[in-house]
Amino acid sequence: MRPINLTEPVPSEFQLLKPHQWPLFMLGFRPFFLLAGLWSVLAILLWQFILNGTLSWQAQIPATLWHAHEMIFGFASAVAIGFLLTAAQTWTGVPGLSGKGLMILVAIWISCRAIFFFYADNQLLLLLGQVLFWLFAIAYLSHMLVTSASKHNYIMIVVLALLTIFNSAFLMSTWLGEYSLARLFTQLAVLGFMLLIGIIGGRV
């Protein structure tokens, strides 16, 4: 496995760029690492405000499960997908997701964060958004790996599919009021991300 060695894509000349042409959307890690960092700080602040009563949590789902979901399926998913969509470009030689496609994926991720905080009881809408985010990312990563016949990396698709299942099961559990079961799926997701980290560590 070759080390990650990216050539920075930059505009060929200075001009007024449309949003999908911004350097921010030329590589997957750029928007997702930025958003993951910002969200990790904001989510912790919101959690602190909920704990001390500054913010009133009105949803039926326990705030602890909102916090767990956002740290695991919000923050961690952004880091994982941002990294994989970028690193796979080196592993496969296939261009990673960029431009309008990357903007759409980022918009889905942001929408899911907003839905869960402002409309936490609408678990069905959040479920659709989260599944769409995972499937979009998995589909493009699969395209990169299959196009290059990078069979030894197919395991990553399997792990991401498991994380999609855990995320969906978590949201279905909260929708049905099975909060103990939802906590179980957060624990399984943590193990899933640990497995993904171990696999990536063996690649780089």
Language model segments and positions:
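Hydrophobic alpha-helical transmembrane segments of multi-pass integral membrane proteins
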Residues: 1-204
